[in-house]
Swiss-Prot record:
Signal peptide: none annotated. Keywords: Ribonucleoprotein, Ribosomal protein. It comes from Halorhodospira halophila (strain DSM 244 / SL1). The keyword Ribosomal protein applies. This is Large ribosomal subunit protein bL27.
């Protein structure tokens, strides 16, 4: 009887593509208007002066200048702002 037993199936073998999240421009770096500063899920970083928020919570520069990261308020939230160069 030269039979081979059937191989089992697996429920693994899938993975999603990486979303390339994180800080794209660090503190002290010069940026131009429209530059992406942070890609994030939710408000890990909050927008400060001259920083806009996209519909996917991406933070971007509204004007040219220098990136500044700081902690603000009683909750010590992380905030990103653009300082005029």
């Amino acid at each position: 009887m030269a039979h081979k037993k059937a191989g089992g199936s697996t429920k693994n073998g899938r993975d999603s593509q990486s979303k390339r999240l994180g800080v794209k421009r660090y503190g002290g770096e010069s940026v131009s208007a429209g530059s992406i500063i942070v890609r994030q899920r939710g408000t890990h970083f909050h927008a400060g002066e001259n920083v806009g928020v996209g519909k996917d919570y991406t933070l971007f520069a509204k004007s040219d200048g220098r990136v500044v990261f700081e902690r603000k308020g009683p909750a010590q939230r992380r905030r990103v702002r653009i300082e005029a160069a």
